[in-house]
Amino acid sequence: MKEFKRYLELDRSQQHDFVYPLLFQEYIYVLAHDHGLNRSILLENADYDNKFSLLIVKRLITQMDQQNHLIFSPNDSNQNPFLGHNTNLYSQMILEGFAVVVEIPFSLRLISSLEGKETVKSHKLRSIHSIFPFLEDKFSRLNYVLDILIPHSIHLEILVQTLRYWVKDASSLHLLRFFLHEYRNWNTRITPKESSFSFSKRNQRFFLFLYNFHVCESESIFVFLRNQSSHLRSISSGTFLERIYFYGKIEHFVKVFTKDFQDILWLFKDPFMHYVRYQGNSILASKGTSLLMNKWKYYLVNFWQCYFYMWCQPGRIQINQLSNHSLDFLGYLSSVRLNPSMVRSQMLENSFLIGNAIKKFDTIVPIIPLIGSLYKAKFCNVLGHPVSKPVWADLSDSDIIDRFGRIYRNLSHYHTGSLKKTSLYRIKYILRLSCARTLARKHRSTVRAFLKRLGSELLEEFFTEEEQVFDLTFQETYSTSQGLSRGRIWYLDIICINDLANHE
């Protein structure tokens, strides 16, 4: 953030909404390509002179402005004689700079709040790590949960129209439309994982900005309703979610519900309502009744249809009772199970046995999704039988063993939040045998002959159990007489592990 302030030198009170002139500043493209902010932006570089010329930027934007986007020819060439270079290449690079520029208004609002202009309540700024204490402390006290797949099929014009409430620079928004027309994907819909954007692979920053902005907008309804129902303005919400234009959308809600908008706010005053999002999924959990959750579902479906103008299938929102269903979230199967207990009550000469059921939060490791991930990575077949990994056969023996061992250690590390880890023994078996078959394939031998020659202990040391690592780490903290508690452990780095740990 300091680098942005030093290079941009914007007057936030007047100029932070006018970002279009920044596209003609060459250091923006240095920022976009991570050339480093400590060195001079005027450093001579042949690559830099050819790709980040101010003249090229001006010419390309002028050409895009004069182009007739209603006429498309399949024989159009990427080579433009006016520019003398590859137009698509320069469009890619300008879009990368645009991704940096369009983030500036959001960054400046955050900086102003952190500098003390607005007081930010720490409990309002939650990260992904706040999910773990929520599961531990709150989950067992809730009754119902809405399992939501965040809608993502949204037309790009809707995003541009919504973005103009944040960025009030019309020139920048027009340029964004030009870029989308340039790639002839104006009728494309945004998706979180697979996109038909021709620039999505090279411009991940811009693509992620659009998707995260869309998610931010879809979540804004929760902040708006909470503020309206409780009549308390959340200071931190003003930093991230400016709801100015939401008041103009109240008419849509009135038409949908055929009642006055204020009459339905009582539905959202539940103090036990919790909202959690992780990747493309979110949950809305409550201590309320099934009727309340159905009304929430009905409200969300209509909100997405009226505000984003997109069809949201009701099946994307599942209502589950925690006592009867397990929630597939964060790579775990989480549930609230009843732990029965009997209490003897003595009154004078009579004694009674009283049954008492205690709610307990429980997490298990889902074996089927894990095997499915191993199957996609070609460590086993669809039934879970280990197979060799031919693409790794050219590596050294130590590299092959290290790769297999690292995958298992990551999976074991990820699932330390579960008290029942029996499923991991199956995963360990698959990876160990797949590793042995890969080594045997490399040495043109059988698995039995290979292990007999080198010994099965060769693989054991690379598949260290997470519990053994935990013992080695904390053996000095706990006395051996008391033993080490085998409780649930949530590591804060689990979101950075490989795709297998995330079941993708």
Curated annotation (Swiss-Prot):
HAMAP family tied to this protein: MatK (MF_01390)
Entry keyword set: Chloroplast, mRNA processing, Plastid, RNA-binding, tRNA processing
Name of protein: Maturase K
UniProt-recorded Gene Ontology molecular function terms: RNA binding
Subcellular location: Plastid, Chloroplast
Gene name for this UniProt entry: matK
GO cellular component, one term: chloroplast
An annotated GO BP: tRNA processing
Family, similarity comment: Belongs to the intron maturase 2 family. MatK subfamily.
Pfam families given in the database record: Intron_maturas2, MatK_N
Annotated transmembrane regions: none
Its biological purpose: Usually encoded in the trnK tRNA gene intron. Probably assists in splicing its own and other chloroplast group II introns.
InterPro entries from the UniProt entry: Domain_X (IPR024937), Maturase_MatK (IPR002866), Maturase_MatK_N (IPR024942)
Superkingdom: Eukaryota
